[in-house]
Swiss-Prot record:
Keywords in alphabetical order: Cell membrane, Membrane, Symport, Transmembrane, Transmembrane helix, Transport
Gene that this polypeptide is encoded by: INT4
Free-text comment about domains: The C-terminal domain (546-582) is required for plasma membrane targeting.
Biological classification of the source: Eukaryota, Viridiplantae, Streptophyta, Embryophyta, Tracheophyta
UniProt organism field: Arabidopsis thaliana
Name of the protein in its database record: Inositol transporter 4
Cysteine pairings via disulfide bonds: none
Regions that span the bilayer: 35-55, 70-90, 105-125, 128-148, 162-182, 188-208, 290-310, 317-337, 345-365, 456-476, 494-514, 525-545
């Protein structure tokens, strides 16, 4: 049926999906056309990681001000918060198809503005427009696919949206790598997003509106016509009847609680089942962001440079691994989430995340401790005014290399020109400038400004990849699944919307603060901080989030009516009652 129980994407359903879409390619056309919104979502959140490296080269103020770098990245997230919040109203008022078309226009405007930006503030404006589109696409694309898919394969089709998001991120890294040596590098990287937006806009013009939205607007004949193209003739009447009952029930609920946003919000927080559902739903969404995942996706080339790889091209090539692993993890999740359960996958994922973050903190700490020393003679071999001002007094007195190292040099906002003999040998601490970088390179040396040459760099890449491997199948996809199941039917849209906004707000906080945190605490301290946040998140997931695998919506509602308690607390409570009875 169009409305009802949980749509699961199990092995049988995937087989049925291929069989049905082979017989009725129109269904796949609907799903893939709408799914381009997920691809755009992933592309625009991932492309900035590589583009930022070259934006810093073109604009000195961006290179010198970490808050400006953070703002360029996070303004898309700020726009997404608004896009997701307003998107719900646009979806209900103008329809799913129109919402996707509006999102495409916003994507295109943002891409054009960024591609031709003459100054950093114009890039920020473009990122805000892109954010509006991302926010709308994040909620509209899966909604359209769900409402325009046959029930028996809905789970399989909707689950591809998550795969397209991670696929879009992977595609963005490929594009970044492709334009490394092209004049205008970052302008091409950011502008390419306009191409799939145009493609989706054209495709959606020839596709229909969601049959559910049409029925809700009393355009019943149009709704039937679409269902007749999706379902076999002998199933259309049953679908129409299910649609009728669902819409009538929805209207009856609105008559009781009112259809205004404030009335629905009051009804939700006055309902203990919804409150407990929101506690679980918001917990998993906030935890998803505070494990630090989007700092890895947004800043992975920068993190690779923190690990000691100076080349932009090398950094982007290595960070391509993280996005590829993320996409692979989405496929793994689709295979196992209905076999092992949502709660178990998230808890296992969180344990792995915490372990990887602690190891990464240790690796970066050791890299900082064992960073190459600064040699006074090496620093003086350049022009008199080329030595870093903070190190100049030590260079003048010919201080021994043990006094300063590369990491201290970089924290003084200077650059490190590695020894031409061996990159880990003592080098020079010099002024941070393009001229100095060119001078250093002309002598056959490597210039470092974001990280120091390190023997630990390979370990950092390995555990960064392992972090993605343990994140993607659990905390990467399951929070969205939980939020589609945890709320009563009449509050699912509102509850999911509140949880989605909490996700984007958390995303904004983390992405806006990451570079400032690495500047203040170092990479090691920042990863350790995320490990602490992840530990807190693990505790609240264990405490508040029930297992919803295999449960119908009514069963989830009954579970939340009595309140969820972890098995450990239930056993202790039972033991306490037995002692009292004795």
């Amino acid at each position: 049926m169009v409305e009802g129980g949980i749509a699961k994407a199990d092995k049988t359903e995937f087989t049925e999906c291929w069989r049905t879409t082979w017989k009725t390619p129109y269904i796949m056309r609907l799903a893939l056309s709408a799914g381009i919104g997920g691809l755009l979502f992933g592309y625009d959140t991932g492309v900035i990681s590589g583009a930022l490296l070259f934006i810093k080269e073109d604009f000195d103020e961006v290179d010198k001000k970490t808050w400006l770098q953070s703002t360029i990245v996070s303004m898309a997230v700020a726009g997404a918060i608004v896009g997701a919040a307003v998107g719900g109203w646009i979806n209900d008022k103008f329809g799913r198809r129109m919402s996707i078309l509006i999102a495409d226009v916003l994507f295109l405007i943002g891409a054009i503005v960024m591609a031709f930006a003459p100054a950093p503030w114009v890039i920020i404006v473009g990122r805000i427009f892109v954010g509006f589109g991302v926010g709308m696409a994040s909620m509209t694309s899966p909604l359209y696919i769900s409402e325009a898919s046959p029930a028996r394969i809905r789970g399989a089709l909707v689950s591809t949206n998550g795969l397209l998001i991670t696929g879009g991120q992977f595609f963005s890294y490929l594009i970044n790598l492709a334009f490394v040596h092209t004049p205008g590098t970052w302008r091409w990287m950011l502008g390419v997003a306009g191409v799939p937006a145009i493609v989706q806009f054209v495709l959606m013009l020839s596709l229909p509106e969601s049959p559910r939205w049409l029925y809700r607007k009393d355009r019943i004949a149009e709704s039937r016509a679409i269902l007749e193209r999706i379902y076999p003739a002998d199933e259309v009447e049953a679908e129409m009847e299910a649609l009728k009952l669902s819409v009538e029930a929805e209207k009856a609920d609105e008559a009781i609680i009112g259809d205004s946003f404030s009335a629905k919000l009051k009804g939700a927080f006055g309902n203990p089942v919804v409150r407990r559902g929101l506690a679980a739903g918001i917990t998993v969404q906030v935890a998803q962001q505070f494990v630090g995942i989007n700092t890895v996706m947004y800043y992975s080339p920068s993190i690779v440079q923190f690990a000691g790889y100076a080349s932009n091209k090398t950094a982007m090539a290595l960070s391509l691994i993280t996005s590829g692993l993320n996409a692979l993890g989405s496929i793994v999740s689709m295979m196992f989430v209905d076999r092992y359960g949502r709660r178990k996958l998230m808890i296992i994922s969180m344990f792995g995340i915490i372990a990887c973050l602690i190891i990464l903190a240790t690796v970066f700490s050791q890299a900082a401790i064992h960073a190459p020393k600064i040699d006074a003679f090496e620093s003086r071999t350049f022009a008199p005014n080329a030595t870093c001002s903070a190190y100049a007094p030590l260079a003048a007195e010919n201080a021994p290399p043990s006094r300063w190292n590369c990491m201290k040099c970089l924290r003084s906002e200077c650059g490190f020109c590695a020894s031409g003999v061996q990159p880990y040998a003592p080098g020079a601490c010099v002024v941070l400038s393009d001229d100095m970088k060119a001078t250093c390179s002309s002598r056959g040396r490597t210039f470092f400004k974001d990280g120091c040459p390190s023997k630990f760099g390979f370990l950092a890449i390995v555990f960064l990849g392992l972090y993605i491997v343990v994140y993607a199948p659990g905390m990467g996809t399951v929070p969205w699944i939980v939020n589609s199941e945890i709320y009563p039917l009449r509050y699912r849209g509102l509850g999911g919307g509140i949880a989605a906004v909490s996700n984007w707000v958390s995303n904004l906080i983390v992405s806006e603060s990451f570079l400032s945190l690495t500047h203040a605490l170092g990479s090691s301290g920042t990863f350790l901080l995320f490990a602490g946040f992840s530990t807190i998140g693990l505790f609240f997931i264990w405490l508040l989030v029930p297992e919803t695998k295999g449960l119908q919506f009514e069963e989830v509602e009954k579970l939340l009516e009595v309140g969820f308690k972890p098995s450990l607390l239930r056993r202790r409570e039972k033991k306490g009652k037995e002692v009292d009875a004795a």
